[in-house]
Amino acid sequence: VANHGLVFAWGPQSHKVIAYIAELNLSPEAKKYIVEEFNINNLADVAIWADIIRKKRKNERPWHYTNIKEGEWVYVQERDCPDSNCLVEKIKTFSKIVADTHTLFIERRDALKYLVHFVGDVHQPLHLGNLKDRGGGRIRLFNSGKNVSLHYLWDGGLIDWEKENLVEYATHLNSRILDSEKSEWLFNFTPYLSLADLDAGLSLI
């Protein structure tokens, strides 16, 4: 969550792990379509693209988070994002662009790259919150003797990435997801999209 233009983001490793998990849950047809239609062999290769270009496109910073009114627990678009310039609404927007074969190739390809990243962002709980604690940035605690923010820990500070193989870690995490959970994520639409919705969106093409 951000304030006055300040934006926190999942670390590169976290985004790539999420992208690997997403790819493990794509149908063979959807995976083939991504390769042939968009020339993207691995979703992890484009997982941090939106963070890279955000440095130059400051107007896109609000796309990486959604602020929900303090005291509320459910996202309401009319109240929380009336201009549609937030993470939740951008996921919806780019999902439609990816599925629209009448849209220019470069726009659809960029939309897919945004989607891979933003679905990762929305799975970081502190990207959906209120401004009061700046997405956990103002909550300080000690971890391994270091004074760090709660947001830092969520972004990857709890994992020693130097000791982790990203593909193996993603495979391990994916193995812990029940088939019933995947089905629920796929068919039970929530205010934000789950990883499985990428597959569902592509199936409409």
What are these regions (language model features)?
Residues 8-118, 125-205:
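N-terminal, motif-rich segments that launch catalysis or mediate targeting to/interaction with membranes
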